[in-house]
Each structure stands twice: as C-alpha cells, then as structure tokens.
Amino acid sequence: MAPRDKRLSSTPLEVLFFLNGWYYATYFLLELLIFLYKGLLLPYPTANLVLDVVMLLLYLGIEVIRLFFGTKGNLCQRKMPLGISVALTFPSAMMASYYLLLQTYVLRLEAIMNSILLFFCGSELLLEMLTLATFSSMDRI
C-alpha cells in the first residue's frame, strides 16, 4: 500500500477505463443490432450466428470484469486487481480480433469498431504496465 500522502494512481489510465466503459456499452448494443441485421438479411448460418452471439455475451463478461478490476486496482493503488486486469486484457484483445477477422461476415462498421477496441486494449495495457511498475517501485521505498 502506498503512503497516505503519495498518490500513485494514473489519471490517464482512469480516463481510458472510463471512455472504454462507455464505448464498450455502445459497441455491445450496436453489435447486437448488427447480428440482428445479419440474421435477417444475410444468409448467415444459424449455428454460426448463435456461436457469435454467445461469444459476444462472454466478451461482455470479460470486459466488464477487466474494467472493474482495472479501475479498482488503479484507484485503490493495489497491484493484484490491476494484474488481473492486465491478464484479462489478452482474452479481451483476442475476442476483438475474432470479431475483426474471423466472423462469417465482417461489416465495415464492425471492422472500425473492433479496431478502436484493440486500440483501447493496447493503450490500457501500456498504461497498466507503467502503473504497476510505479506501484512496485513505491513498495521498495
């Protein structure tokens, strides 16, 4: 734990978590509407559509947990929750990559939205690692 007079939380990281939370909520709703569009108007195999929607729900769970632990770890200046958030960044980036590259049909809007999600993941990972290094260096003092 950091001394009481020393604030080590990363403000840019917290801003990214906040923006990513709102962006992901919008992404999730748009992606559900896009799947509805694909299911109704495109010859989308039913099994693939069900799989993609189930994976989107799993992605929602991973992302909510990742953002929660990242925010709590940053604000409370704790390494463990921030480390959990770092570990969950990789499955989150893999899911964004799946929706960017491996779906049956990838619309241009989806490609743009998933690219933005990957940018958020990369930026947050970099800032989380720097914040973890800051927390660790203050433990030695």
Curated annotation (Swiss-Prot):
Subcellular location: Membrane; Cytoplasm, Cytoskeleton, Cilium basal body
Pfam families: Transmemb_17
Biological-process GO terms, alphabetical: cilium assembly
Annotated GO CC locations: ciliary transition zone; cilium; cytoplasm; cytoskeleton; membrane; MKS complex
Transmembrane segments: 15-35, 49-69, 82-102, 115-135
Main location, first listed in the record: membrane
This protein's UniProt keywords: Cell projection, Cilium biogenesis/degradation, Cytoplasm, Cytoskeleton, Membrane, Transmembrane, Transmembrane helix
Domain of life: Eukaryota
Lipid bilayer topology: Multi-pass membrane protein
Described function: Part of the tectonic-like complex which is required for tissue-specific ciliogenesis and may regulate ciliary membrane composition.
Protein name, per record: Transmembrane protein 216
Native source organism of the sequence: Mus musculus
Gene name of this polypeptide: Tmem216
